[in-house]
């Protein structure tokens, strides 16, 4: 998934950047991006002059840009096998190219130090210059350890260079020119925490209204296979994890609604959003970028980057507008549990149009097997294991968003769990197979679950938990409203909501 791609900048390419740079909003004393890119030139004289200019005008807000360069200098061997310009276009091999870079992946975020034996390699020389310069400016001694640099950087408060986003867009464009359409406009998050996930724009193929079949015809599924169940307006559908994990995104129609079903495999969330913004139909796709290990989508109208977990715009023209994607409820459960509850359900078939190993547990097997993260995040919390599953809820209040995480293990041991949170009386009902559904309790007190799986209140009355309502047997026409909630890995939820409350640690 994460493949190395050589990266070379030449003086010709640097000049091209200077011609492309927007100048509005840049103070007179701010070095232009041509200076930053010249600092990694193969021309030692030009690089020295650029670094002297940066030194004379240095402020902490320039450090993240230099750290970006350290990442892209990490190319391994073959420094001169391909030359790429800042916008992703090829530069001829005789144009004086310089540095290189590649996709980070685990230990490969460190530059191969054995390459420093070859002092004539222009990329090695550029790396040494940038690292030495950054160490002198910051007083840090991280050498070629990119992860150490960015972990340190995340602890710093600084005013970024006004064209930092433009620099990122042009660096990433060496892997896919489409990255240039991002990073325009405002940002609601720190740009130094937005990183490339190792795939091009749209590089993980989405499922476009995938074919479905009935429960009786889905012989490829075992009862213990994990599915994500969604119900809209009385229509039920199961999205098997073994399929969705390979695609991370499905555009679908269910119950008369157009849906964007997004699966962030890294942070463990499946959220079916309505495919509209402000009442207008909008198509979302995979950007190839992450924020704190959370998959970022982009809309095809404005090219704004959206958090797949919060449903909010984070970088681009839509930031600052009062817009947010509308989530629908989803449950994580077994195929046996889902089809028993909804015998009329439809389910995705294996006829996706793609060649993948759709056996249970094949996708991301190594990642799911350990508690290790594929991409570091700036904030973590040790009260639970990184990939411990939690049920995630959030509510808007007058003082902002209130976030709540409830351990899935806690809910499995307390299958009827009631709590007052953010001024709301909530009850979480959990099936024996672990499917969690949340309802507005509305003043009722719920105490237990009987042998038939019905919820029992403090008066001894029984209730049935369905996909829309918690319905009293005494009045099948009534019921308590179900609220959107979804599973997530603890680290992924905490990284987005570090002020979250946690129950069940």
Language-model-derived ranges and their functions:
Residues 23-27:
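Sec/Tat signal peptide C-region and signal peptidase I cleavage site
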Residues 10-21:
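Bacterial N-terminal signal peptides
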Residues 67-73, 93, 98-120, 132-505:
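Mid-to-C-terminal functional-domain signal that highlights helix-capping/loop sites
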Residues 2-12:
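Bacterial N-terminal signal peptides that target proteins for export
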Residues 47-51, 126-134:
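Conserved hydrophobic register position within alpha-solenoid helical repeats
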Residues 54-61, 134, 138:
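Alpha-solenoid repeat junctions
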Residues 44-45, 75-79, 124, 128, ...:
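Alpha-helix N-cap/helix-start positions at coil->helix boundaries
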Residues 28-38, 59-81, 143-148:
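Amphipathic alpha-helical scaffolding segments comprising HEAT/armadillo-like alpha-solenoid repeats
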């Amino acid at each position: 998934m994460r493949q190395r791609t050589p990266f070379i900048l030449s003086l010709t390419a640097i000049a091209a950047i200077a011609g492309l740079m927007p100048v509005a909003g840049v103070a007179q004393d701010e070095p232009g991006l041509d200076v930053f890119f010249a600092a990694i030139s193969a021309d030692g004289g030009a690089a020295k002059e650029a670094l002297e200019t940066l030194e004379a005008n240095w402020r902490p807000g320039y450090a993240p840009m230099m750290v970006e360069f350290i990442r892209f200098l990490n190319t391994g061997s073959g420094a001169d096998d391909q030359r790429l310009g800042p916008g992703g276009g090829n530069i001829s091999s005789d144009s004086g190219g310089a540095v290189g870079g590649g996709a980070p992946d685990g230990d490969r975020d460190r530059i191969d130090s054995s390459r420093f034996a070859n002092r004539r390699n222009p990329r090695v020389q550029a790396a040494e210059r940038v690292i030495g310069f950054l160490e002198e400016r910051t007083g840090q001694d991280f050498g070629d350890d990119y992860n150490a640099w960015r972990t340190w950087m995340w602890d710093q408060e600084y005013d970024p260079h006004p064209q930092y986003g433009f620099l990122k867009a042009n660096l990433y464009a060496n892997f896919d020119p489409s990255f240039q359409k991002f990073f325009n406009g405002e940002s609601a998050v720190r740009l130094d925490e937005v990183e490339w996930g190792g795939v091009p724009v749209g590089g993980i193929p989405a499922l476009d209204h995938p074919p479905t079949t009935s429960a009786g015809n889905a012989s490829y599924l075992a009862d213990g296979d994990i599915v994500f169940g969604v119900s809209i307006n009385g229509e039920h559908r199961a999205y098997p994890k073994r399929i969705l994990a390979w695609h991370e995104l499905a555009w679908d129609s269910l119950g008369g609604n157009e849906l964007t079903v997004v699966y962030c495999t890294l942070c463990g969330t499946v959220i079916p959003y309505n495919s509209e913004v402000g009442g207008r139909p909008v198509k979302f796709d995979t950007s190839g970028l992450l924020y704190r290990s959370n998959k970022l989508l982009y809309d095809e109208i404005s090219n704004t980057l959206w958090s797949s977990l919060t449903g909010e715009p984070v970088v681009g023209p839509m930031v600052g507008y009062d817009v947010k994607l509308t989530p629908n409820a989803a449950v994580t459960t077994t195929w046996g549990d889902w089809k028993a509850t909804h015998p009329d359900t439809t389910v995705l078939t294996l006829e996706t149009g793609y060649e993948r190993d759709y056996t249970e547990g094949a996708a991301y097997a190594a990642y799911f097997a350990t508690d290790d993260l594929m991409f570091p995040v700036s904030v973590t919390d040790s009260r639970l294991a990184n990939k411990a599953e939690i049920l995630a809820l959030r509510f808007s209040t007058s003082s902002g968003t209130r976030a709540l995480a409830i351990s899935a293990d806690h809910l499995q041991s307390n299958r009827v769990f009631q709590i007052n949170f953010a001024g709301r009386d909530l009850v979480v009902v959990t099936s024996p197979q672990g499917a969690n559904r949340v309802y507005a309790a509305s003043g009722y007190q719920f105490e237990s679950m009987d042998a038939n799986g019905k919820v029992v209140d403090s008066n001894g009355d029984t209730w049935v938990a369905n996909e829309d309502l918690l319905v009293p047997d005494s009045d099948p026409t009534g019921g308590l409203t179900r609220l959107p909630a979804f599973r997530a890995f603890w680290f992924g939820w905490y990284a987005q909501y570090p002020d979250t409350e946690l129950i069940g640690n």
